[in-house]
Each structure stands twice: as C-alpha cells, then as structure tokens.
C-alpha cells in the first residue's frame, strides 16, 4: 500500500547519516535520499518533520543544535529548493543561520527591527501605488509585500556588500490570472518606475530547473528605495 511504501522509505532515510561538511558528499546524500523516496510525498513529510524539529531545536544540546542545522543546510534545504517549496526553504534557511551563526543572525535582526516601521510604511505606500496603477489599466490582481528575511540579507552581506549598501530588502509579489497579464504588468511597472538595469529575469519563458515560473524585476520607488517585484499567475504559484 501507499502508506507502507511511505513508512518504509522514511525509515530508510532516517537511518542515513546526513551531516557533511563536504559538498560532494552532501550532493551524494541528496541523491541517495531522493533515490530512496519512491513517492515524492516521502520528501514532503521528511521536510515537514525537519521544519518541526528545527523550530524546537532550542530544546536540545547546543552542539547537537549546530549539527542538525548544518545537516539541514547541506542536504535538506537544497531538496526543498528542488521541489519548489519556498516557504519551508525560507524558514529553514533562517533557522539554520540562527543556530550556525547566532551573532550574525541577531545583528541583522536588530538592524532590521530598528527600521522596521519605516520599511513597512514604504512597502504599504508602494503597494498602494501599484494597486492604483493596475486598477487604472483594468487588471485583476492581488499584491503581497514583505521585508526580506534575515537569511536573504545575510547572503547579500556575504558577497562583501556593506549594510549601508543594501537597499533591496523590500519585495512585492503580484498575482494575475493570465500569462499575458504578467508581461503587461511588468510593462506598466517599468513605465511608471525606473527599472534597475540587468535585473529583469524572465522565468516564464525560461523556467528554473524546479519548473519555477515568474517575472522578476527591481525598480526605484518615488522615495528612492529599491523594490524587488515578482509577477506570476495564480497557477504558477501553486
């Protein structure tokens, strides 16, 4: 039965020693884990279990906390990425950073919290401007906005950028009904707001390896802040 296959696959995966500092071994372990999963639901269950474990990671010994975080980072997060489960991937990334580099995590979080009210205000203003623009052009849509995660900002800092040089920490996602509307929305956005050169990415015509589809761009708002904007259909987001 399906249940028996899932239970047996999970049992095999749970016996694996997943911790590895070596990239080659981590890649091998990911392949083994995928190979042991006769049903993709096994990987979803494993990721859900690991997310629960990481959320309660504080309850175990510090040495084991870091070991579990490193294991998650090298083996399980790439699998979440491959499956396109971005919500789990993002939360795991933040939790892993918290347990592997707590000082870095807390420093970024403290800086974010100091400017959070201003960031949220700017985000809401941009949402209103975009909403008015799309309504004026008769487009059915939904907009969601967010301040980027601690891990996302950490990755930018890791490239050598200074905190004062990081402007693109505000992101908006626009959902529309048809693929043609995605391109129409991008055209309207670029006509009203100045786009950042070389930041437009068409993942609809050229999907990512995990079949992720969306249009990405970055624009300057009227206040000079930088906003990352993603446009996709509801179907592409499923």
Question: Residue ranges of each PLM-predicted region?
Answer:
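Hydrophobic or amphipathic alpha-helical targeting/insertion segments
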Residues: 1-11, 85
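Nucleic-acid processing machinery
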Residues: 15-43, 50-238
């Amino acid at each position: 039965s399906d249940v028996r296959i899932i239970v047996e696959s999970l049992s095999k995966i749970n016996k694996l020693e997943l911790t590895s500092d070596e990239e080659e071994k981590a890649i091998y372990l990911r392949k083994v884990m995928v190979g042991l999963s006769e049903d993709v639901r096994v990987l979803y269950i494993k990721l859900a279990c690991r997310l629960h474990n990481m959320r309660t990671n504080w309850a175990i010994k510090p040495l084991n906390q870091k070991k579990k975080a490193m294991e998650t980072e090298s083996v399980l997060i790439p699998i979440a990425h491959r499956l396109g489960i971005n919500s789990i991937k993002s939360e795991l990334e933040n939790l892993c950073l918290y347990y592997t580099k707590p000082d870095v995590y807390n420093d970024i979080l403290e800086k974010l919290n100091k400017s959070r009210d201003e960031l949220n205000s700017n985000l809401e203003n941009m949402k209103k401007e975009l909403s008015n623009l799309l309504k004026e052009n008769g487009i059915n849509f939904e907009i969601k906005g967010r301040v980027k995660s601690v891990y996302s900002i950490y990755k930018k800092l890791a490239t050598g950028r200074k905190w004062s040089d990081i402007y693109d920490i505000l992101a908006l996602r626009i959902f529309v009904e048809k693929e043609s509307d995605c391109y129409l929305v991008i055209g309207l956005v670029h006509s009203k707001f100045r786009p950042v050169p070389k930041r437009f990415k068409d993942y609809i015509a050229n999907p990512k390896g995990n079949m992720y589809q969306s249009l990405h761009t970055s624009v300057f708002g009227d206040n000079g802040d930088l906003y990352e904007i993603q446009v996709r259909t509801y179907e592409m987001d499923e």
